[in-house]
Structure formats: structure tokens, C-alpha cells
């Protein structure tokens, strides 16, 4: 090679070495990447300053008033590329929680300008959540994804709206169906693979009686980078699910004799299963080999839930039931006794007292848990279960669908994954909701065994006054819940999470707190995700506010992907 060619090659190598990590540092979707690992390749900035505080949900006070101060709303993760931040905003009117369709949703494109995060454009959507008073108690999430140089957001009729990232105009509506049916709903969060192909769920409901009649259809949708799309019946991906009219084991009713089970040999009642459909708030995850992982649930009976692996041509690869996976009920996590919180004496060890069978994982429509693909191609999913103090279970399946292990917490969590030293670690919140309450951030090893925990020990509820000063009152003797549903991890393995005490925390490896910064008190707030930008700024949420936190590190430009 000539000296000039050698120099050009070295320049190219140096450029690629710089650009690729920066591109990987962007946060274009839930969990930052197709596998949802929640990790970026840059170090986050120090938690020195509140650099921005923007209200994106103007109805929080009304939403909290409807539920005695609690906020039962799910929000998207702030999406970040090198050009700016993309966040959902709500408008319209708030009537009642039973009529959340009176609200409107949009995406705002924000950009840093002279140290402030300013509005560039607004892209309105005609998306509406599934009707209230049904499977979801929490207001469902409206969530976008960045791919192919565009932003894609949910639209009406199970469609996807392709938005120009430079000015917010609608490029096209992508409709995988034959016409725009307002009774078909985008179900969950769109996810993009490394090539820019997007996957999301959708299902249809009866217009007059959406929740007492079964679904009219359910699909997994695939959208190619050129905008072509295809919808495959969701039931074809879960061949081991019961037929919609089958009877499926449910739980003992409210009038059943306590403690449960009503007798050691009691058999739980059955109800109609309903058609299998995607979870309302779950995103697909995509493995490095292109396998798509989705979760599904029978429409009338959530105790029949599934994790399915799908090939890139939308044919089924395998489907695993989440039913009867756990043996930690009576006599293990639930003591025998005579109160309603106990198991009846004589019940088989390990059963869930609610149905007298081994415990089952539920794909809850009030949870945002989404599958996470681990570095070896196996997959995690956080389920709901009630008998263990409504803590759920984190489940682990091999890449071939074999149930590997579970951990005694999985409620509303999409774990973050930190690769290090030839292995990986898994980060979750771990709240104990039943007295004595206690709240942890827990890091697990590759076998779901705890490596370390960081316990919430702050007892002070604080508030920021008009002058900016923070004052506190000691009123939470057990600490505060971790109100995070998807942690973020930077290149050093530092974990970023938010708490109901209003602080954003940076927790180092070993469970050592490195920094924290007060945002605003968030008692009773819904769980929210965090993101880290290419320049290391951290984007956190709290009660309808978007906060940007950081120090004074220089911003470095990256390519859009």
C-alpha cells in the first residue's frame, strides 16, 4: 500500500472506532437496543445539574386526584439521538379515568440550544388506547421508536405513522390491514431490529362491547424499512394456547372459604379462555440472530400467558407457557396459618393458594415488562404473580424455549443487562410491598443469583420551593419504592434508577451509591424508564415531567441510525 492509502485506511479505522460506539450510545427505543439490554457505550455525565424540566403530561394533578394521589399512567422512555430528544406529550382534555380516550397524544422533537432543551416540532397522532374498564387499569403507554432516520409512532387502527425527524411532518401512514378500522389498536411498544425492521402487536375489539366479547383478531406486525408491512395472526405464533372457547382454570372466587385453598383438595373454577393476543404494554425483543420474542395472554383469563419465539419470516419457532412454572407458594413464601394471608393447613407445599396449583406467571396488561435477550441468546421476562406479595417472578428461558430458572420478583420490570468479564449481570428493582416494606435495586448473576443489593434507606420526603430550595420532612420509616420499570446502565456499569423519594440515583458496582440528585417527590407515581444520550446526559421522568440531568462534559456528534 502507498503511504497515502495507508494514511486514509488509518483515518477510516479511527473514524469507525469513534462513530460506532457513539451510534451505539443512542437510545432509539425501549431498552436502548433490539435486545432491550438498557446499556450504552458511553459514561453518563455527573449528576450535577437539573438541565431541563419539561411538563409533558398536563393532567397529572387530575389523574392523581382520581386515585387519592396515585398516578396510574404509563409513559414512554425519552428517545435520544445525536440531533435531540423525542418525547410523548399529552393534550386534549382529561375527563375521567374511565374515558382516557378524550386525551390526545403526540411526539415533540426537542433540541439542545444554548443550554436549554427547546421544542422544535410537534407530530400529532390519532392513536387511542384500548377502551378503559377492561383488561388495563393503568392508562396504556403510547410509545415511539427511532429507525431508518425516521420516528415511527402508533396511529389509529393499528397503524404506524412515519415521521420526518427534522421537522415532524407525516411521511406516510403504514397500514398492514385492508382498511383503517378504528376498533383495531396498537398493542404495546414498537421495537426495531438492527436493520431497521419494526415489529409490534395489534388486536381488535368489539365496538359496542369491547371487554365482554372476545377479541375480533390479534396480530404481530412486521414493517420493513421501505414501509411495506405484513400482519400475521398472533394465534399462529402460540399454537399451544387453548382455543378461544375452551374453559381454562381460573382462581377461587371472593366468596371462597379463607384461608385459601378452600380445602387441600379444592379445584379452582374454570372460565372461558378467550383468544390469545399480545400484552397491551409489552414490546417485542429481537435477538442477534433475528429471532423475535413476544408475550401473549388469553383475553379473558390472564393466568394463561405465553412467551413465544418467532422467526424473521413470522413463522413460529417455539412457544412456552408461563403457567405452573413456580413451586414457591404454600409453605415456602406463603406460610401456613389461619388468616386470609396464609395457606390452609394441609395444602400441598409450593402451590399457589389462589388456584391450588403450581404458581403461574401472568402477562399483566398493567405491566410494561418486555422480553430481554441475554448475550447467549436466552431470554428474560418479568411476570406478575399475586401470592408472593404481588411481586411477580422474573423468568429465564433458553434460546430453544426450555425453562431455566426464575427469581422472586418480576413485576413491571424490563431488566437491564451489563456485560463484563466474559459474563453478564442483570439489574432489576425489587420492592417488597407487604409489611415489613423494604425496597432494593438488585443485581443478579447470569444464573439469577443475587450479586449485590442497594436498599432504599432515605426516610425524608422532600419538596422544591419556588425559590429552588429543597426542604424535607421525615415521614417514610421504611424508605421509598423504586419507581423504575427499565433501568439504564452506562459503560462503567453504573446503574441509573429513579425513586419515589424524587431522587435520581447513580449506583456503582457492588451496590455503592455514587451520586443522587433531587428531581421532585413522586409518591404513588407510576414506574418509568430512563435513558442516556450519546453525550452522557441522563433523561429521567417523574409525575409527568421530563428531566435532563448532567454536568459539563462536551457533546460529541454521532451518526443517526
Task: Describe the residue ranges of each PLM region.
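Noncatalytic, solvent-exposed loop/strand surfaces
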Residues: 23-560
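Bacterial N-terminal signal peptides that target proteins for export
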Residues: 1-11
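Bacterial N-terminal signal peptides
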Residues: 9-19
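Intrinsically disordered, low-complexity regions enriched in serine, threonine, proline
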Residues: 5-6, 19, 557
Amino acid at each position: 500500500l502507498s503511504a497515502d492509502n495507508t494514511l486514509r485506511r488509518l483515518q477510516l479505522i479511527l473514524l469507525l472506532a469513534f462513530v460506532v460506539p457513539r451510534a451505539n450510545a443512542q437510545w432509539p427505543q425501549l431498552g436502548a437496543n433490539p435486545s432491550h439490554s438498557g446499556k450504552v457505550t458511553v459514561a453518563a455525565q455527573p449528576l450535577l445539574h437539573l438541565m431541563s424540566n419539561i411538563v409533558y403530561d398536563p393532567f397529572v394533578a387530575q389523574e392523581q386526584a382520581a386515585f387519592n394521589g396515585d398516578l396510574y399512567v404509563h409513559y414512554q422512555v425519552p428517545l435520544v439521538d445525536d440531533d435531540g430528544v423525542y418525547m410523548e406529550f399529552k393534550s386534549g382534555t382529561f375527563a375521567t379515568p374511565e374515558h382516557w380516550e378524550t386525551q390526545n397524544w403526540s411526539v415533540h422533537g426537542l433540541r439542545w440550544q444554548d443550554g436549554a432543551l427547546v421544542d422544535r416540532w410537534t407530530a400529532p397522532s390519532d392513536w387511542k388506547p384500548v377502551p378503559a374498564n377492561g383488561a388495563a387499569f393503568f392508562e396504556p403507554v403510547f410509545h415511539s421508536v427511532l429507525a431508518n432516520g425516521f420516528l415511527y409512532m402508533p396511529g389509529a387502527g393499528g397503524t404506524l405513522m412515519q415521521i420526518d425527524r427534522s421537522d415532524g411532518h407525516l411521511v406516510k401512514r403504514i397500514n398492514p390491514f385492508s382498511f383503517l378500522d378504528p376498533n383495531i389498536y396498537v398493542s404495546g411498544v414498537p421495537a426495531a431490529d438492527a436493520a431497521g425492521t419494526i415489529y409490534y402487536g395489534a388486536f381488535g375489539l368489539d365496538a359496542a362491547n369491547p371487554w365482554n366479547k372476545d377479541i375480533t383478531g390479534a396480530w404481530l406486525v412486521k414493517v420493513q424499512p421501505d414501509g411495506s408491512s405484513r400482519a400475521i395472526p398472533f394465534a399462529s405464533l402460540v399454537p399451544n394456547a387453548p382455543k378461544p372457547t375452551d374453559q381454562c382454570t381460573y382462581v377461587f372466587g371472593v366468596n371462597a372459604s379463607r384461608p385459601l385453598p378452600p380445602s387441600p383438595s379444592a379445584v379452582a373454577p374454570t372460565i372461558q379462555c378467550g383468544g390469545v393476543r399480545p400484552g397491551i404494554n409489552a414490546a417485542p425483543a429481537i435477538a442477534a440472530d433475528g429471532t423475535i420474542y413476544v408475550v401473549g395472554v388469553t383475553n379473558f383469563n390472564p393466568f394463561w400467558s405465553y412467551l413465544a419465539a418467532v422467526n424473521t419470516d413470522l413463522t413460529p419457532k417455539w412457544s412456552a407457557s408461563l403457567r405452573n412454572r413456580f413451586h414457591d407458594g404454600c409453605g415456602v413464601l406463603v406460610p401456613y396459618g389461619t388468616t386470609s394471608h396464609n395457606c390452609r393447613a394441609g395444602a400441598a407445599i409450593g402451590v399457589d393458594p389462589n388456584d391450588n396449583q403450581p404458581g403461574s406467571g401472568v402477562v399483566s396488561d398493567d405491566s410494561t415488562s418486555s422480553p430481554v435477550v441475554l448475550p447467549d441468546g436466552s431470554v428474560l421476562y418479568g411476570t406478575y404473580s399475586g401470592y408472593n406479595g404481588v411481586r411477580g417472578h422474573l423468568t429465564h428461558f433458553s434460546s430453544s424455549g426450555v425453562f431455566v430458572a426464575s427469581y422472586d420478583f418480576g413485576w413491571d420490570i424490563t431488566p437491564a443487562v451489563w456485560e463484563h468479564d466474559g459474563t453478564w449481570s442483570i439489574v432489576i428493582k425489587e420492592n417488597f410491598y407487604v409489611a415489613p416494606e423494604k425496597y432494593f435495586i438488585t443485581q443478579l448473576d447470569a444464573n439469577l443469583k443475587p450479586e449485590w443489593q442497594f436498599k432504599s434507606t432515605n426516610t425524608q420526603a422532600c419538596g422544591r420551593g419556588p425559590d429552588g430550595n429543597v426542604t424535607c420532612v421525615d415521614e417514610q420509616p421504611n424508605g421509598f419504592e423504586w419507581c423504575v420499570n427499565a433501568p439504564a446502565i452506562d459503560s462503567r456499569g453504573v446503574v441509573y434508577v429513579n425513586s419515589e423519594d424524587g431522587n435520581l440515583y447513580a449506583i456503582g458496582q457492588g451496590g455503592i451509591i455514587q451520586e443522587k440528585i433531587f428531581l421532585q417527590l413522586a409518591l404513588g407515581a407510576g414506574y418509568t424508564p430512563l435513558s442516556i444520550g450519546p453525550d452522557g446526559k441522563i433523561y429521567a421522568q417523574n409525575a409527568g415531567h421530563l428531566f435532563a440531568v448532567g454536568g459539563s462534559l462536551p457533546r460529541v456528534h454521532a451518526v443517526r441510525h
